[in-house]
Amino acid sequence: MKLFLLLVLLVPISVLSQTKEYVCPPCNHSCDEVVYSKPGTCPDCHMTLVAKSSLRYENLTVDEFCERISSNPNAVLLDVRSKGEFDGSAWRSTYGHFKNAININVEELEERMGELDKYKDREILVYCSHSIRSPRASAMLIENGFERVVNMSGGVSTIDPKSDECLRKYFVVH
């Protein structure tokens, strides 16, 4: 009987301790700090919630991102915007892109992941326009075995290439 009572008390505790936590991939909104108990969609930014444990990538400001490019010439730059946004042919403002960046639209990343396999041992620096797609792409890279993934918070829309020598050196304005 004592064993039964002990089991009744311990089972709920072990079940509770295994409960997954879900979060919105960092998008620079207040919802970045909210933790949910089940999968779904963020009510604020409408991004798909991900397991909190999957967010094992580093987030850097634009200035820190540029410094990382300077200090790590072997890093791979991954622009996850559309081809039109990347090359400046889109109908809306496209801002520009980092020199030597690889462009794979986040919508195509899952099926094109194999193109990046040769870079698994290198640091991958991921960016987009407003830091909405790049956190999603960063999480996908981590889920696919990439261990050194860095996301640029804010996106290229926050860049003023005239204000920083590093950005003038590495960023192409459309």
Task: Indicate where each model-derived feature is located.
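Short hydrophobic beta-strand that contains or immediately precedes a catalytic carboxylate
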Residues: 76-81
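Short, surface-exposed ligand- or partner-binding patches at beta-edge/loop junctions that are enriched
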Residues: 127
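Hydrophobic alpha-helical transmembrane segments of integral membrane proteins
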Residues: 8-9
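Rhodanese-like catalytic fold shared by cysteine-dependent sulfurtransferases
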Residues: 19-63, 68-71, 84-123, 133-174
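Positively charged n-region of N-terminal signal peptides that target proteins for export
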Residues: 1-4
